[in-house]
């Protein structure tokens, strides 16, 4: 694959609302990475790569703290899309039943419990292709206001958004919006056909233009090549503004999905991906996301050494398992790592 391989619509992901603070001296924040440069980093001897990532991480994030994010499925199943990894797609027989949107009080009760357990960001996910105006969206806005009233950051992942919907979410107090690219532009068509890469970039641009922080990452272990992994990270890093949060997910192969036979992601691959993300996007929160239940404590700590400073926290990530609250808090205590406080926003 030539170094000049690029996304035709990279310029569409150029929102100007979020401007990161100037980086510390000696930290290089770039937006012009070539594929060969990214791959050279990814393929460094592992200890050299982790050392380089940790050096960058320490220059930007001086405290031994991680952001704890709780994720709740507020509308489960019945999604009309065909994402090959997703058990919530209506066309796959995965045992996930379509449910109605949760009631606002139930969501806020879950948020309150997550806060009591130590989470500072509460993310609400709905299995929709796109947001539609009406009573359900009004309920989501009420959920956002309620989460913010609890003193937590509020995040949502609801599918594609219009400009006016993004603006209304911001007015309700939404802190961040998650909309992953999932994989490289080249591999994307093998995973999803019902939404284009450009659709995703366009939604991210609308989120930024509304003044909402972007949470955007991807999934490894979906049959992609090393070049695909590197080009996903390159696509994220070469945007005009790096995402505020970059979730790195390891595929959880669910029976009934087209990717059910995929092999478990090796720890070394996860560490390399996280470390490379940290070097490319020094000021972003790099989130250790799905697949953590398959990792032992040492593997998770190695990911943190490589630059992960955010965790999805709680017993379930939408429909897949995750370590229990008590396990995570015990792990952090053993490692001398403390939870990061929620950001104070205007």
Curated annotation (Swiss-Prot):
Keywords annotated in UniProt: 2Fe-2S, 4Fe-4S, Biotin biosynthesis, Iron, Iron-sulfur, Metal-binding, S-adenosyl-L-methionine, Transferase
Catalytic activity as recorded in UniProt: (4R,5S)-dethiobiotin + (sulfur carrier)-SH + 2 reduced [2Fe-2S]-[ferredoxin] + 2 S-adenosyl-L-methionine = (sulfur carrier)-H + biotin + 2 5'-deoxyadenosine + 2 L-methionine + 2 oxidized [2Fe-2S]-[ferredoxin]
Co-factor remark: Binds 1 [4Fe-4S] cluster. The cluster is coordinated with 3 cysteines and an exchangeable S-adenosyl-L-methionine.
Pathway noted in the entry: Cofactor biosynthesis; biotin biosynthesis; biotin from 7,8-diaminononanoate: step 2/2
Stretch list, region Disordered: 1-21
Top-rank taxon: Bacteria
Skewed-composition ranges (Polar residues): 1-12
GO MF term list: 2 iron, 2 sulfur cluster binding; 4 iron, 4 sulfur cluster binding; biotin synthase activity; iron ion binding
SUPFAM superfamilies, A to Z: Radical SAM enzymes
Segments forming domain Radical SAM core: 64-292
Enzyme class: transferase
Sites where the protein binds [4Fe-4S] cluster: 79, 83, 86
Cofactor(s) listed: [4Fe-4S] cluster; [2Fe-2S] cluster
GO process annotations (BP): biotin biosynthetic process
EC number(s) stated in the UniProt entry for this protein: 2.8.1.6
Pfam families: BATS, Radical_SAM
InterPro entries (alphabetical): Aldolase_TIM, BATS_dom, Biotin_synth/BioAB, Biotin_synthase, Elp3/MiaA/NifB-like_rSAM, rSAM
PROSITE patterns to which the protein is assigned, alphabetical: RADICAL_SAM
Binding site for [2Fe-2S] cluster: 123, 155, 215, 287
Role summary: Catalyzes the conversion of dethiobiotin (DTB) to biotin by the insertion of a sulfur atom into dethiobiotin via a radical-based mechanism.
Known partners and oligomeric status: Homodimer.
Family of this protein: Belongs to the radical SAM superfamily. Biotin synthase family.
Protein name: Biotin synthase
Organism placement in taxonomy: Bacteria, Pseudomonadati, Myxococcota, Myxococcia, Myxococcales
